[in-house]
Amino acid sequence: MYDNIIFDLYGTLIDIHTDEEDIAVWKHMCEFYAQHGVKYNPAGLRSRYKRQIRRAEQAMAKKRFKFPEIQILEVFEQLTLKKDQTPSDCAELTVAAAQEFRKASTGYIRLYDGVTDMLEQLKQAGKKLYVLSNAQRVFTFPEVQSLGIEGYFKDISLSSDFGAMKPDAAFYQQLLDRNHINPNRSIMVGNDAVCDVLAAKQVGLHTCYVHSNISPVDDADRDIKADIIMDEVNVPEMCRLILEDADR
């Protein structure tokens, strides 16, 4: 029986399309920065952003985790800082810039059909719900709030907070330890065969794999060994299968 259901977010509960390469995004960000006294051209801003990402990744590679995660706010901090400023001087603008970028680069974001009803049913059945997602808090938390699902979860664990991402077992373990979760009575639900199935099994979790429109392309060639396997996103069926499997 499953007492705890751990969900991935994007591609599992949330359907999203983003495009950070679109030059229109960078034109928009140049206009945003210009309003705050920071001047860029679109190509130059995009190049500097990528350069700061690489630097952050190189710095994190020296950390203890096998799959480290950067903190995107530190990237936007470097883009936002003016001469003679300290990070605290531009903290609010850094957050605003990051969130403006996320909105500008998002083509659409929505819940898959039936997600709210599923979460409600699982709660009514006495299940404890959690999130474990490779995501940046400055982007994701406002999205979770705007989609109206924040209140269903006992804990929302995001990779940017911990400094490591799935498939790192340490990222899983910190959620289990903090919430005193028994993996034998818990299931991980996600759309990535490596991050959400193989990695979850390493820490003793049961698994539900759902193939979605943003699952990794090479998942189609993998021999996926999950307790529940879904070939497409069908949230009512997902809910039924989880509850059915939980009661065995």
Residue map of PLM features:
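Asp-based, Mg2+/Mn2+-dependent phosphohydrolase catalytic module
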Residues: M1-I5, D15-D19, H36-A43, T116, ...
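Short, acidic, Ser/Thr-enriched surface-loop or helix-capping motifs
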Residues: D8
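Basic, amphipathic juxtamembrane/active-site segments
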Residues: E20-Y33
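Short, solvent-exposed amphipathic alpha-helices that sit
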Residues: H28, V75, F139, E143
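A metal-dependent, Asp-based hydrolase signature
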Residues: C30, P42-Q99
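Short amphipathic alpha-helical segments at helix boundaries and their inter-helical linkers
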Residues: I53-F67, K103-D113, Q202, H206
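Short, acidic loop-to-helix structural element flanking the phosphoryl-transfer center
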Residues: K66-E74, A91, R102-Y130, F141, ...
